[in-house]
UniProtKB/Swiss-Prot annotation:
Residues 1-87 form a transit peptide. The gene is ASA2. Feedback inhibition by tryptophan. Its EC number is 4.1.3.27. This is Anthranilate synthase alpha subunit 2, chloroplastic. Signal peptide: none annotated. The lineage of its organism: Eukaryota, Viridiplantae, Streptophyta, Embryophyta, Tracheophyta. Belongs to the anthranilate synthase component I family. It comes from Arabidopsis thaliana. GO terms for molecular function: anthranilate synthase activity.
Length: 621
């Protein structure tokens, strides 16, 4: 039969090219030994495999950056690769192993469902995606990241911190002044060894959220927990999971990195550490390459009709109460106590759509740079945030306030006209500059003298339905500080609190009736090496999981659904000339815009196809 020899010729991609064709006969199918693609820290030896397919003998090879493949007749990896792992383990105590696979058969949505079953909504896990804004259209971000089964969980409520070490089967509880010191101290014990082949994305570490009330660990005297509004949900203030296993999708190069971080156990041999790490990696890879992957509901989408879900009438504040709070805030502004304050209220929407279905719909309704589906203890977060809270990479910190908003135009010409109008709006530009100054002050607290600068002032960022005025503030972290110190300095940002920030937050405690929880805090990841990428928790729905409802709903299919309550919080920036009616309407519009994802999920996944209609157009988010 014919044999085709194929080899990879392009670095970074799994590409193949036909080299030669020969003819020979194979009387009996050969026996194939088990195959393991070698993983390395730098440059592994070559590995290849001959396969008989029909009447052709195929020779496959693959290449990553500086990686070659060769035939390996056993599960043992090469001496060269093992030597490199051994050297890395001598330098540090965290060493990543990875496997690169084709991603053309897999999506981040499907990969998440392979790791977390549909009925396991209490399992800590996450899916991070990104859509980069563009002038005419948005482009999908290069990387998506999926993770499940954290080895350690940290849950803080007030000053009580619970640490669940699943690897050691230990659960501890202690009272501390600052719960963020707990993960910070754990990280001080690490010495991670990076490798060049891994992508420029989050590849493992802490994932979770920091609530708005995290600021009370820093401003203990002016913003004590005792002065906080009613805590009607009892959600954790800090909720983190440590993920040794992640899957990173590279949408540009059409491949996925399956990554496992090996914790070097000094009481075990290097061989044992290496073998256990490879077994964990093999197990993780097999879970996303299941012969029978989970079936995802297809959904039916009919856009641009006029069918919407129920109006968001239930809120933590009546319209009259919110307007009275606006009037009182204006009195403080006129008295010179503050310049601006952001007052929010929390709306409620009941639904039989599953939060994961709502996340899938949100990707269509409101694609944004920080898309997140995050399951943690006590709640599920479904987020579509446009704004960085803090980015820290190689000790360079970035804060990018977004303030000043106008809708997108229906045509490119109208877009340009609206952009000029936005930049000519003195009120919105003045508010933006005030918040940029606040950002400079926050970044300056933890930066080297002279390193703080505004790189982009009053830039315009285009999103799916709106455009924002954006500025970028950068600084270089002081030598004796870490990313955690930078997070303490900026959380929460002025765009969700006001200016001066602490005084505005004192008034928020007086004027808002319930705690904000995750809203206006931050969510994201802290890498093993200390880099941090935290998004501002705006346009974020919170689904409490610690409350169960007896209501079940049965559709034409046999699946029975539980009822969920979505908490959608939105705020408005109050200044001296604010109109209470307009500010209340702004909160309603922002919340209703996010609720369009629930409308789409209900019509796509719950109703019959012929009734599936929804309009995702949003004028102002």
């Amino acid at each position: 039969m014919s044999a085709v020899s194929i080899s990879a010729v392009k670095s970074d991609f799994f590409t193949v090219e036909a080299i030669a064709v020969t003819h020979h006969r194979t009387p009996h199918p050969p026996h194939f030994p088990s195959l393991r693609f070698p993983l390395s820290l730098k440059s592994p030896p070559a590995t290849s495999l001959n396969l008989v397919a029909g009447s052709k003998l195929l020779h496959f090879s693959r290449r990553l950056p500086s990686i070659k493949c060769s035939y390996t007749p056993s599960l043992d990896l090469s001496e060269e690769q093992f030597t490199k792992f051994k050297k890395a383990s001598e330098k540090g105590n965290l060493v990543p192993l990875f496997r690169c696979v084709f991603s053309d058969h897999l999506t981040p949505i499907l990969a998440y469902r392979c790791l977390v079953k549909e009925d396991d909504r209490d399992a800590p896990s996450f899916l991070f995606e990104s859509v980069e804004p563009g002038s005419q259209s948005s482009n999908i971000g290069r990387y998506s990241v999926v993770g499940a089964q954290p080895t350690i969980e940290i849950v803080a409520k007030g000053n009580v911190v619970t640490v669940m070490d699943h690897g050691a089967s230990l659960r501890t509880e202690e009272e501390v002044d600052d719960p963020m010191m707990v993960p910070q101290k754990i990280m001080e014990e690490w010495n991670p060894q990076g490798i060049d082949e891994l992508p420029e994305a989050f590849c493992g570490g802490w994932v979770g959220y920091f609530s708005y009330d995290t600021v009370r660990y820093v401003e203990k005297k002016k913003l004590p927990f005792s002065n906080a509004p009613e805590d009607d949900r009892s959600l954790p203030d800090v909720n983190l999971g440590l993920y040794d296993d992640v899957i990173v999708f590279d949408h540009v190069e059409k491949k996925a990195y399956v990554i496992h971080w090996v914790r070097i156990d000094k009481d075990r041999s290097v061989e044992e550490n290496f073998r256990e790490g490879m077994n964990r990696l093999e197990s993780l890879t097999s879970r996303i390459q299941d012969q029978k992957p989970p079936k995802m509901p297809t959904g039916f989408i009919k856009l641009r009709t006029q069918l919407f879900g129920p109006k968001l009438e239930k809120s933590t504040m009546t319209s009259e109460a919110y307007k009275e709070a606006v009037v009182e805030a204006k009195e403080h502004i006129l008295a010179g106590d503050i310049f601006q304050i952001v007052l929010s209220q929390r709306f409620e929407r009941r639904t039989f759509a599953d939060p994961f279905e709502i996340y899938r719909a949100l990707r269509i309704v409101n694609p944004s740079p920080y898309m997140a589906y995050l399951q943690v203890r006590g709640c599920i977060l479904v987020a579509s945030s446009p704004e960085i809270l803090l980015r820290s990479k190689n000790r360079k910190i970035t804060n990018r306030p977004l303030a000043g908003t106008v809708r997108r135009g229906k045509t490119p010409k109208e877009d340009l006209m609206l952009e000029k109008e936005l930049l000519s709006d003195e009120k919105q530009c003045a508010e933006h500059i005030m918040l940029v100054d606040l950002g400079r002050n926050d970044v300056g607290k933890v930066s080297k003298p002279g390193s703080v600068e505004v790189k982009k002032l009053k830039d315009i960022e285009w999103f799916s339905h709106v455009m924002h005025i954006s500025s970028t503030v950068v600084g270089e972290l002081l030598d004796h500080l870490t990313s955690w110190d930078a997070l303490r300095a900026v959380l929460p940002v002025g765009t969700v609190s006001g200016a001066p920030k602490v005084k505005a937050m004192e008034l928020i405690d007086e004027l808002e009736v319930t705690r904000r929880g995750p809203y206006s805090g931050g969510f994201g990841g802290i890498s093993f090496n200390g880099d941090m990428d935290i998004a501002l928790a705006l346009r974020t729905m919170v689904f409490p999981t610690n409350t169960r409802y007896d209501t079940l709903y049965s559709y034409k299919h046999p699946q029975r659904r539980r009822e969920w309550i979505a908490h959608i919080q939105a705020g408005a920036g109050i200044v001296a000339d604010s109109n209470p009616d307009d500010e209340h309407r702004e909160c309603e519009n922002k919340a209703a815009a996010l609720a369009r994802a629930i409308d789409l999920a209900e019509s796509s996944f719950l109703e019959a196809p012929e009734f599936t209609t929804i309009t995702p157009h949003i004028n102002n988010i």
